[in-house]
């Protein structure tokens, strides 16, 4: 006996059988030991062969176990095993069978065959009693082998290769496991057309990720099962190849090729009855290629060219260009079928078809208006993904969120339960007290506790009953779905009596029960069970940060008072505040042009009048955070090439993978304020990039991705024409110099750029009367810095007037005032705090002197503590 002639699996079994014989204290190594390890094998090749040959595996296991138990045991032996004569004959028979079949190695099935044939071995009787005959087993082995010989030590791995490395889509379609495929008739028809060709009958579905390429393959499987295909495709099997399973565990060179050859051999020997579906087809190129080995695509080419292999591929446009088109020999063997993104209307139809499956899974109802909202909102607000995938995901997540709410405790019940817990803790504390007041309190508390516990029990029962009703409707939907699948199977098999019972008996009855259950659910209760457009809008807002969901009354009031809110921070610029507020209100009311940014403005005015401050105030108003904006300082973009910093470097340049400062910020957060500060400082060519942003609300970055700017508010600031605005009189309006200022602007920017901006807003130079208000705003900021120290500041009217007069300079706006306040107020205050003249918790009154401010400090903490 030469072990080199045996396959790896058989060698492993022989070793396991020896170990088992020693562990059972047997002295002889017999055929029963071999049969025992064969039928106990996890991968179950021997067990599968016995079943297919008409035998009972359970009977074999019982028979072999009984035989092993009856064997003599030798305690305290020398650990040696003796080969029994019957087993030697079994090995000899197995080697002869392998030689006769032209095999290079003795495989598991030949060993099993020898166990049935060798009459001197008890295993032949055990297998015969279980219903296995040598003739039946031989027939099954020939079916499994399909004419192939065992040429390698791992030959068993390649039996039933399609079962291991592919999924039968037609079997899934028959079992009703596939989602219905709605629409896509043209693409499926085109795929069938290519499959029906004589040669090169291999379509490849090419489209963006998420447009439904895999769904088309599933649609083809459903059509084959329903017989809705031409004669040439009737009763074909569509198998989805799993490239991951094919490559996984192929450790040695040649193992991957062997597996793939086994798959191809099975497909070829099926005489065109198997169509192979390869999802992510680009993975074929280079798959398994290592140390000079052939990759999968080269192994497939000959079979594809001869028409022996029927194949449907699917890949994205980018991957097809990157991998498949580079190999023209592979590309010419496939016929591209382009799959476009469906329209919003088609997406709604697709969602309607899938609705039942999602209702069944989440056990909630999904309204039709929610499906329409999912299609329209995803199309408008989720720019970097494709329909119908993004719309399906929205519906799925909205239903998941609602289900989570249904399973969570209602708010009213949660509040009562928390109150009960609080009272129970209080009761335990009061039990220790002996005074009358505590005893009275305990009696009252016990009474309240009883009432709350009754209320809690009542609400819990009501909530559980409503949940149960929802569960009943979900169960009925599941039963209805199963009944419809059963009806389809019965019609396909021609079992018309069963089909009639289902169509006119069971299905109408279930539909009636479901209608009644849904009518019960429809009544208002504690549990919300229908997914509405509001739920979908909430998910969109969570994904993108864009406020699409329904405005609450508080937000409406806030938007209507927007001018007043921003006016608290920006002084003397009513026209600018109003223009920006109107743009935001238009956007939130849904009346803005959906293909342009929310608004685009150029703020013109002298330095220090509040151009950048207005933008910060706007970001703070919309997002409660001054820094919630993209601020691009255009003074950094004075060279022509610096535009790459905005949109990202082109391919081949350093930093290509990093993306641009502007495009990446907006991609991550599509709803925000974008500020281009000091635009006149930038190189004129930089503005060419902004033309598409201002007109179409989109920009293509260095990597070719389209970034959506339709939900941004674009503000540009500039000092152009400031000299005209500074020289205006105290009571003169900016319209008096508008033409002169616009003349300077037109000389600096191209007409096509200015023509795309919504409005050019001129900022007034700050008047003397505005300065008092600015002093108050700056003073409030200083007060907020002292909150931690509990120091209270107060500034009298004369001090405000003194600071405003000292800090007023029409040419420089509010910035000189900031410097004056720093020098005259903050610096002396800091010194006094450090010297200990002003203590934490003091009240400081600031008054004006002839040439400086006076500080009077009065400690308040001590008094407060004494009172306490």
Curated annotation (Swiss-Prot):
GO molecular function annotations of the record: ATP binding; ATP hydrolysis activity
Keyword match Cytoplasm: yes
SMART domains: AAA (SM00382), ClpB_D2-small (SM01086)
Chain intervals for the UniProt region annotation (C-terminal): 766-868
Residue stretches in coiled coil: 392-523
One GO BP annotation of this record: cellular response to heat
Domain of life: Bacteria
Protein task: Part of a stress-induced multi-chaperone system, it is involved in the recovery of the cell from heat-induced damage, in cooperation with DnaK, DnaJ and GrpE. Acts before DnaK, in the processing of protein aggregates. Protein binding stimulates the ATPase activity; ATP hydrolysis unfolds the denatured protein aggregates, which probably helps expose new hydrophobic binding sites on the surface of ClpB-bound aggregates, contributing to the solubilization and refolding of denatured protein aggregates by DnaK.
Name of the molecule in the record: Chaperone protein ClpB
Organism of derivation: Mesorhizobium japonicum (strain LMG 29417 / CECT 9101 / MAFF 303099) (Mesorhizobium loti (strain MAFF 303099))
Annotated gene: clpB
